[in-house]
A protein has these predicted regions:
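Conserved core of the sugar-phosphate nucleotidyltransferase
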Residues: 126-215
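Conserved nucleotide-sugar donor-binding
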Residues: 215-227
Length: 303
């Protein structure tokens, strides 16, 4: 069975003005998302599912979905504040979405096969899709609790225009993930890659340290775990009182690992990540895409 690609496209970029999901960066106005979908099709994915906001649907259908017709089946799911389990109500003052794992849950009725989750505004590059696509395609039929994460080498994921936030990963001797620790300020400091610790000190890490770029491989049983844990999350009064509390994928993954419920294989990739974290990054992404086209990695026009 071909795996499915799940794109999380309901969030808006906080650091970069404008609807960055729709920003044309390729020569014919292609978005980063278009390149991800092209790479996924090449890597053997058979269906694309988007999670978006309902009020974004018309724009999305007209500007995005129409171009994929005839290339790959697509489905839309919607993330909203009131999409909560029975018995729970969204606090009246909350405006922030419930987080990446809540977005994943929105696709539970349309995904019945192994799937890969990605952000829509990160350029992951071809090798990353091939690595995760192979892992998912090779899973035995009916596989459960055997997941994966593409571990990008931190030195391949930096911005020239400021710090980036990344989940720094540790794994055991079998290559399985043991922890993901979110570090919100990572950059090169006088040569080495460093993150700022809780005391405000710079701590150096090796360039090839794996980090999470939110590229995960799951089987459909992940939805069951997520539904159960989301109820626990909502039952905790502090998560309801804190209007910015979010149900993130690493929160769920860490719980499953700590309870020995699931294993998450860290898959190495040579891919260099790029994205528009800051407005000043935009031109460098345009230039990098053009150089990949010049090298023959992508055609001039994707779809």
């Amino acid at each position: 069975m071909k795996p499915t690609l799940l794109l999380l496209a309901a969030g808006m970029g906080s650091r970069y003005g404008g609807l960055k999901q729709l920003d044309g960066l390729g020569p014919n106005g292609e978005t980063i998302m278009d390149y991800s979908i092209f790479d996924a099709i090449k890597a053997g994915f058979g269906k694309i599912v988007f999670v978006i906001r309902k009020d974004f649907e018309d724009d999305f259908r007209n500007k995005i979905l129409s171009k994929y017709e005839g290339h790959v089946p697509v489905e839309l799911c919607f993330q909203s504040l009131d999409a909560l389990p029975e018995g729970f109500q969204c606090p009246a003052d909350r405006v922030k979405p419930w987080g990446t794992n809540h977005a994943v849950l929105m696709a539970k009725d349309v995904i019945k096969e192994p799937f890969c989750v990605i952000n829509c505004d990160d350029f992951y590059n071809r090798d990353a899709f091939q690595v995760i696509g192979k892992f998912l395609a090779d899973l035995p039929e009916g596989s459960r609790n055997s997941y994966a994460m593409v571990g990008f080498r931190v030195g391949n994921t930096l911005s020239d225009n400021g710090t980036v936030a990344r989940g720094i990963c540790s794994n055991d001797d079998k290559g399985n993930l043991t922890t993901v620790v979110e570090r919100t300020e990572i950059m090169r400091v006088d040569g080495p890659v460093c993150y700022k610790d809780e005391q405000g000190e710079w701590v150096a890490v090796e360039d090839n340290t794996p980090v999470s770029m939110n590229m995960w491989g799951f089987t459909p049983d992940y939805f069951e775990h997520s539904e159960a844990y989301f109820k626990e999350f909502l039952s905790d009064p502090k998560n309801m009182e804190n209007l910015k509390a979010e149900f993130f994928i690493p929160l769920m993954v860490n719980k499953l690992i700590n309870e020995n419920t699931a294993t998450v294989k860290v898959l190495d990739t040579t891919s260099k990540w790029f994205g528009v974290t800051y407005s000043a990054d935009r031109q460098s992404v345009v230039d990098k895409i053009q150089s990949l086209i010049d090298e023959g990695v992508y055609p001039n026009k994707l779809f």
